[in-house]
A protein has these predicted regions:
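Catalytic cores of the polymerase beta-like nucleotidyltransferase superfamily
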Residues: 1-417
């Protein structure tokens, strides 16, 4: 008679008192015909996975054997003789190799997963098979971020060995990007992803820009961090609760410091512009979605302007808000930018034009007020006399006069707030 167990990340999350994102089940002692007869719908080509009426996944217990160099080159054995223990032993980390009885809620642990969860450690289940899939290096980095765990020394060395042997370069861009994107989810300790890869020298193939960033020294009068990589990681901690798009922008905002010309060091003048090409190269390599690329470039290009908001005249503030809100159409875009600006400015205790958080938030509120006033403003906003004056102009002259008119309108409205 077949038996069904809850397995993997769902069991781990329950032990961590977290709500499981997905629930996966393994069926021991069954076969395809029996599962279909019980009303399950079969999906998947390499090995049988079944969906119940609620869309939850059930997989036949299976063993696997590496038969080639590709991540798809595995032979799967999924007959009724495969045991629960054999199925769990093929998994990557001990915290993911747990099962739970459906009826009794008893947790079955063959590999010390509960111990490692308590100790907040990522440990390879079987070192000899762990190295068969180099993606596990990035999965280790991702789970370190997702769970806020540390990688135990032997597993760390296995990851280092795979990186040094050049195994990571054979991975697909889509698989690497997926792990980074998962590591950047809200409430994750996202900085641990890059910190782990830097520690084990695993950045060369997919993230070389961050090696250069780690070698970029900071000026103490701007950042107390030893180098730009450390500053970026501290800034990432500031946006721990925010979206992956915001985190990616913070991650990339100082990449231009990594290739500062030697003759202008220790200053990093122009790093905001130099960083744009580096973001393009990174996103091309990872095949990152355009929404990540576009926002990261917007923040990189404009993040130095944040530090000067307090000294800007109204026309400059108007232009900045217009640029950061898609011509006063998208307030969420502006809010995301200001969140990134806060992370950069207060990523550590640094001298700045702002004496405290309140000064920064005061200026942010001003930016939002400018948006609220200008959102929806068009020719019909103005009185007939002003419209007639504007219509006497054309081409570039019209654009200049129209902008001046809107700034005067903004100045008057700000005086009413």
């Amino acid at each position: 008679m077949s038996e069904i167990y809850l397995v993997g990340g769902a069991v781990r999350d329950i032990l961590l008192e977290r709500e499981p994102h997905d629930k996966d089940y393994v069926v021991v002692g069954s076969n395809v015909e029996e599962m279909l007869a019980r009303g399950f719908k079969q999906v998947g080509k390499d090995f049988p996975v079944f969906l119940d009426e609620n869309g939850e996944e059930y997989a036949l217990a299976r063993k696997e054997r590496k038969i080639g160099d590709s991540h798809t080159d595995f032979e799967f054995i999924f007959d009724p003789s495969v045991t629960l223990q054999e199925d769990l032993l093929r998994r990557d980390f001990t915290c993911n190799a747990l099962a739970r009885e459906i009826e009794t809620d008893e947790v079955i642990d063959y590999v010390g997963g509960k111990r490692d969860i308590h100790a907040k450690l990522l440990r390879a289940v079987r070192p000899e098979t762990f190295v068969e899939d180099p993606l596990r290096v990035f999965r280790a980095a991702r789970f370190a971020a997702q769970l806020n765990f540390d990688v135990e020394p032997l597993t760390k060395r296995l990851c280092w060995k795979m990186a040094q042997e050049g195994m990571l370069k054979h991975l697909s861009a889509e698989r690497v990007w997926k792990e980074l994107e998962k590591a950047l989810q809200p409430n994750y300790a996202s900085e641990k992803f890059m910190e782990f890869l830097l520690e084990i020298h695993a950045l060369d193939d997919w993230f070389p820009e961050f090696i250069d960033l780690a070698n970029a020294k900071e000026q103490k009068k701007f950042h107390w961090s030893e180098n730009s990589f450390k500053h970026t990681m501290i800034a990432l901690r500031r946006v721990r609760d925010y979206s992956s798009k915001v985190k990616f922008a913070v991650l990339c905002h100082d990449l231009g410091k990594g290739n500062t010309p030697v003759d202008i060091l220790p200053k990093h003048i122009g790093h905001d512009i130099r960083g744009l090409a580096l973001i393009d190269a990174l996103c091309d390599r990872l095949k990152a979605p355009n929404e990540y690329r576009d926002f990261a470039k917007t923040f990189c290009k404009n993040h130095m302007r944040c530090h000067k908001m307090g000294q800007m005249k109204l026309a400059k503030q108007y232009d900045l808000v217009r640029c950061l809100s898609d011509n006063f159409k998208d307030k969420e875009l502006l809010d995301d930018f200001l969140t990134c600006a806060y992370a950069d400015t207060f990523g550590e205790e640094v001298p700045s034009e702002f004496n405290d958080d309140s000064r920064f938030f005061e200026l942010c509120n001003r930016m939002r007020k400018i948006f609220d006033i200008m959102h929806g403003v068009n020719l019909q906003t103005f009185d007939e006399r002003t419209q007639q004056m504007l219509m006497r102009h054309s081409g570039e002259d019209f654009g200049k006069v129209y902008t001046e008119t809107k700034i005067r309108y903004l100045k008057n409205k700000l005086g009413e707030w």
